[in-house]
Structure formats: structure tokens, C-alpha cells
UniProtKB/Swiss-Prot annotation:
This is Peptidase T. The keyword Hydrolase applies. GO terms for cellular component: cytosol. NCBIfam families: peptidase-T, PRK05469.1, PRK13381.1. The gene is pepT. It comes from Clostridium botulinum (strain Hall / ATCC 3502 / NCTC 13319 / Type A). GO terms for molecular function: metallopeptidase activity; tripeptide aminopeptidase activity; zinc ion binding. Zn(2+) 1 binds at H78, D141, D198.
Amino acid sequence: MKDVLERFLGYIKVDTQSSEESDTVPTTKTQLEFAKKLGEELKAIGLKDVSVDENGYVMATLESNIDKKVPTIGFIAHMDTSPDLSGTNINPRIVEKYDGQDIVLNKEKNIVLKINEFPEILEYKGQDIVVTDGNTLLGADDKAGIAEIITAMEYLINHPEIKHGTIKVGFTPDEEVGKGADHFDVKKFGADLAYTLDGGGIGELECETFNAAKAKVIIEGRNVHPGSAKNKMTNAVLVANKFINMLPENEVPERTEGYEGFFHLLSVKSEVETAELNYIIRDFDRKKFEERKEQIKEVGKKINEEYNKEIVCVKVEDQYYNMKEKIDEVKYVVDIAYDAMKAIDIEPILVPIRGGTDGSRLSFMGLPTPNLFAGGHNFHGRFEFVPVLSMEKAAELVVKIAELYANR
């Protein structure tokens, strides 16, 4: 599995950042270009039925080498990197045999990965770790996943003594902007179940995600010359502030954890005449999720009642649901991943995803898809890192899962 590092370092050289603003599919041309390169690589290692469609979805097949019928399994990762920080000119560095101290990422800018801020890195003392130069994200989310899947497929091709059923491979665009499953053709993919490799640290096995919605709040004010504004002006900036303060101050990402939900204010655009607030709403529990959506609408209603006119409009749109609802119906998909980890000396860590993956939506599209670790930490930022051994073990895990299904 040693090839996984070389692959990963090659993939992150390609800028595949997705865009919140774009209406194209995929949202950036570089993703489509990268998809074509991956398609060529999949053909080169010997996969069959390789396709790259106009939307940037890559699919391929590793044919079964056994006679009996077993479930067709899929392995999926996404090609885009987060818009939160630049993915251009990524300049990675390998910290060999990490010594357990702070890591200076960029001496000139005094950017330091500090162990008191990111203590999880101490779990990898003595290992080789890939870090950034402090100017960009790393792209382990999710190019580590891509490298692991392709490395595992090549290993299975080169080791026919390892028995496996039919395996499908899929790479998606635009996961980071919530569109990864928009044009995913589940029927064409042809798997009975799948796994995304889009998780964090080694051992993570995730079969629960948030229920997710987004809310856009439009506030219509009225501007009047401030010298004669009494009883006439409606300042949308102040109304926006009122709206923000009417939601629970402690139910925000920075004050919640585990199974706790939140309202997250993403952006504010405001002036006297008009204001716009953009929120995301998250909760694991479906009932609480529905209550949160009603709660944010109710804030708008109360403000409208106070002003005795419709100055606030709240539009809520569901994004994805907790995949646990669907995965519980085929629990063996989690059990096999759990057993596979144990078989290769990894302690499984069953944790809820405080976020979403392509698997969230795919599970509701008829393809149950829990999430496996890809190995990285601190995604979407300059402090992102990935231990080399974690990537190697993720590739080994893919092989072992395929083997266990063949032996069911």
C-alpha cells in the first residue's frame, strides 16, 4: 500500500476547489479535468467500464474473481476541496518520525501547528505526517480517500489470490458545496451498498449524519433621511441584529458537540434598506430538526407582528437527512466494516458525523453508504494534516472489506 502517498501527493497538486457561487456542473472546470485524469488512471490499472460523464462523475468496475453471488459493493470519494481556503499551489511537507513537538508550518508568517491547540496530533508521534506550508489547505479531504481507493483496487488486481465480488468505484464533484449527489446515477453505478472514504482520523466509522437545512432571511427596511426619520425609517441592519439575537445564543457550532444541534449564521449582508442572513440548521434528531426549522420561521413571524407589517421573509430548504434511518435497515454494512477494522488491528471508533457526506443523500437514494476514515485531521484549513500510515491502513481496510464480503 506504499503507493498511496505518491498518489496523494500527485492529486493535491491539482486545484479542484469547488465554488458556492457557480451554477455550472461541476462548479469548477478543474474538477472535470481532474475527473478525466482519474478516468485514465483507472483504465491504466485495469478497471473496466470506466466512465467520466459531462457532470464530472467518475465510475468504474473491478470485476468479481469468484463464482458465487455476493453483494456488489462500492467505494466513493469526492474530488473537490473546500472553498473555505485556497487549494492553489499546495506545497506539502512530510514531517518524518514526528517528535511530538509543535510543527512550524511557515516560519516567515509564524504559522505553527501547536499541540495545545491540536492535541490529536500527539496520537501519531513517531509516524510520518503530511502537513501544509501554512498558505493553503492540504486536500486530504478528500484526495486521501481517492488515493486510498485506487491503491486498494490496484492491489486487488495485482493479488488475484485475494477473493472478492464485483466492486464499483465512484468519484464525485462538488461534495464540499453540498451538490455531490445531485447528478449521481445510482442505477448506473450498480452497487447494492457502498462506503465513502471521507472521514477523519484512523478508526472512524460513521453511520449517522446531521439532518440538514439552509435558511435565507430577507429583511426589507425603509430608508429615510436620518434628520427626519422618526417613526418613518425601518433600519434593516438593526432588524437583522434583532433576528440574530432572538435565536438561542448557545446553540451555535462553537458551543455544541456530540449529538447537539445548532443554528449557524454563515453570512450577513446588510444596509438600511435591505439585509440578508444565511443560516444552516443542523440536528441529528428528526423531530428536533423539524422544530428548529419552525423556530427560525417563528422568529420572522414575531418580528413582523412587532412591526405590524411583513418586513421579514424566511425561506427554509432541506439539504439532507440523517443516513442512520436507512443504514439501520441493512446494519450488516456497518458490521462488516467494523469487523474489517478489527481484522487489520484498527480499533473502530463509532462516531456521529457533525456534518454530511455524499453518503447522506445516497442512502436516501437507495444506496446505503456509511463513511470510513480517510485519515486526515483539521479539514478545510491550513492546519490540515494526514499521517501516512493512516492512508495506508485505509487502503488496506478497503481490501479487507472486499475480502469479507466475498466470504459471507
